[in-house]
Curated annotation (Swiss-Prot):
ATP binds at residues 240-246. One of its GO terms (cellular component) is cytosol. Homodimer. It catalyses: XMP + L-glutamine + ATP + H2O = GMP + L-glutamate + AMP + diphosphate + 2 H(+). The gene is guaA. Residues 213-402 form the GMPS ATP-PPase domain. HAMAP family: GMP_synthase (MF_00344). The active site is at residues 96, 186, 188. Residues 19-212 form the Glutamine amidotransferase type-1 domain. It is an enzyme of class 6 (ligase). This is GMP synthase [glutamine-hydrolyzing]. PROSITE patterns: GATASE_TYPE_1 (PS51273), GMPS_ATP_PPASE (PS51553). InterPro entries: Class_I_gatase-like, GATASE, GMP_synth_C, GMP_synth_GATase, GMP_synthase, GMPS_ATP_PPase_dom, NAD/GMP_synthase, Rossmann-like_a/b/a_fold.
Length: 527
């Protein structure tokens, strides 16, 4: 019989926690707004633009931010807002579309920017025309990122002009009596030089934030929530060996002790030596009760001949839970399945206002007939926050700073059909890459690095013979939260050493390429 997903007590409903909610209008940057607010020690998360005033009252936020978005406020299908929210007495900051929505709903005027002749995309110089608490401590002229196709031409009654730009006569406005603020630019992106200062001013000066949100708070609350949800029942956790599932394991162990059973599924798609490392690290050092299952043949048989990346993810997600079903049937009274789903996983799998980037192994890969209720203790956290949580839980750096590894494992680092030969090329080349990055002292500077079998064969020469072997790609990126990333500028001598070692030590490889694509437009993983 199918069971529903467990909805863990949401942090945003806890009245003793200050929070600022971000209403989602579909901007590619909206998750960064919540991330920036959290950096200040204030809890923040995205909520649907369809949220009602009663639901906002229940959350009791100290502030509301209306995100940007691609739509026009005057379109028939425009995303709106429950106008009773304006009567709650809560400070509101409208960003880009959010400013236009405030204007439109409160009696101002918004028109297509082409009609007003002030369409703006890219960096622009903002000019302050009045003193404002929102802009306190920032210069009269400052560089901001504009990205709007519509424009405010008349501000609502009660508002006054705060700033403009060459092409935007109303770039910022405010109604200090109601504590409503609107800005036409994006403060959440790094291209807006004083963006953090502006968001800090909103959070602290206008909303009255104390900045007392921390991982210690999160640990205490999550342990309490887990105990309340689980009671005296049992939880099954799938360990992958990655940071996320390891942190979930230690958190659950602290919360419910021996009510937790961990299953480590060796699906035949792990990195070199990973299986033994998981058992030694989490079973030995942390005392987790771990059942190791060798299911490699089951997975590889199902993946034979499959080259579509989403099908790979679905197959692995389905089989992963089926293995759990098989193992759980040997145990008594297991009701819950725990996962290391992160906030970024949920965002990348799409919201009602944004397109799905790709199905995620922790979100879209679960079968409809899943036989467990689902617990996701990390699903409000970004990657760097998970590392901070691991440190707060007393986990050593070698665990906390371990390279991120996707649930589908090496399956999504092999383009096309998965074969034993391709698996071996990725395992061995990845081990060399990790070893050389560590030797160069770059393992804490580079956020993530791995190798990919591109599925492409090319002509080469080794010794006196012609070869026709695989091309291996190196992917190395720098990032803060995983939502955006730049390719890592690794020293040429390090790249050269890695390349020489791989082509000499790994069979069936004769060419190495370096991926110099940022995110966006690419994702971190190749599939």
């Amino acid at each position: 019989m199918q069971k529903e997903r467990v909805i863990m007590t949401n942090i945003s409903t806890l009245n003793d926690v200050q929070k600022i909610i971000v209403l989602d209008y579909g901007s590619q940057y909206n998750q960064l707004i919540a991330r920036r607010i959290r950096e200040f020690g204030v809890f923040s998360e995205l909520k649907s633009h369809k949220i009602t005033a009663d639901e906002v009252r229940a959350i009791n936020p100290i502030g509301i931010i209306l995100s940007g978005g691609p739509n026009s406020v005057y379109a028939e299908d425009a995303f709106g807002i429950d106008e009773e929210i304006f009567e709650l007495g809560i400070p509101i900051l409208g960003i880009c579309y959010g400013m236009q929505l405030l204007t439109h709903k409160l009696g101002g005027k918004v028109v297509p920017a082409g009609e007003a002749g002030n369409r703006e995309y890219g960096q622009s110089t903002l000019r302050l025309r009045a003193q404002s608490e929102l802009f306190a401590g920032t210069p009269e002229e400052q560089v901001v990122l504009m990205s709007h196709g519509d424009a405010v031409t008349e501000i609502p009654e009660g508002f006054h002009l705060v700033a403009d730009s060459v092409d935007c006569p109303f770039a910022a406005m405010e109604d200090t009596k109601k504590n409503f603020y609107g800005i036409q630019f994006h403060p959440e992106v790094r291209h807006t030089v004083y963006g953090n200062d502006i968001l800090k001013n909103f959070a602290f000066s206008i909303c009255g934030a104390k900045g007392d949100w921390s991982m210690a708070n999160f640990v205490d609350m999550q342990i309490a929530q887990i105990r309340e949800t689980v009671g005296d029942r049992k939880v099954l956790l799938g360990l992958s060996g990655g940071v996320d599932s390891s942190v979930v394991g230690v958190l659950l162990q602290k919360a419910i002790g021996d009510q937790l059973t961990c299953i480590f599924v060796d699906h035949g798609l792990l990195r070199k030596g990973e299986g033994d490392q998981v058992m030694e690290m989490l079973g030995g050092k942390f005392g987790l009760n771990i059942i190791r299952v060798d299911a490699s043949k089951r997975f590889l048989d199902l993946l034979a001949g499959v080259d579509d990346p989403d099908k790979k993810r679905k197959i692995i997600g389905n089989e992963f839970v089926h293995v759990f079903d098989d193992e759980a049937s040997k145990l008594k009274g297991v009701d819950f399945l725990a996962q290391g789903t992160l906030y970024t996983d949920i965002i990348e799998s799409g919201t009602e206002t944004a397109q799905t980037i790709k199905s995620h192994h922790n979100v879209g890969g679960l079968p409809e007939d899943m036989q467990f209720e689902l617990i996701e203790p990390l699903n409000t956290l970004f990657k760097d926050e998970v590392r901070a949580l691991g440190t707060e839980l007393g986990m050593p750096d070698e665990v906390v700073w371990r390279q991120p590894f996707p649930g589908p494992g090496l399956a999504i680092r092999i383009m096309g059909e998965i074969t034993e030969e391709k698996l071996e090329t990725v395992r061995e080349s990845d081990a060399i890459l990790r070893e050389e990055i560590a030797k160069a002292g770059l393992d804490r500077d580079v956020w993530q690095y791995f190798t990919v079998n591109t599925g492409v064969r090319s002509v080469g020469v080794m010794g006196d013979g012609r070869t026709y072997d695989y091309t291996i790609a190196i992917r190395a990126i720098t990032s803060i939260d995983g939502m955006t990333a730049d390719f890592a500028k690794l020293p040429w001598e390090v790249l050269q050493k890695i390349s020489v070692r791989i082509v000499n030590e790994v069979d069936h490889v004769n060419r190495i390429v370096y991926d110099i694509t940022s995110k966006p437009p690419a994702t971190v993983e190749w599939e």
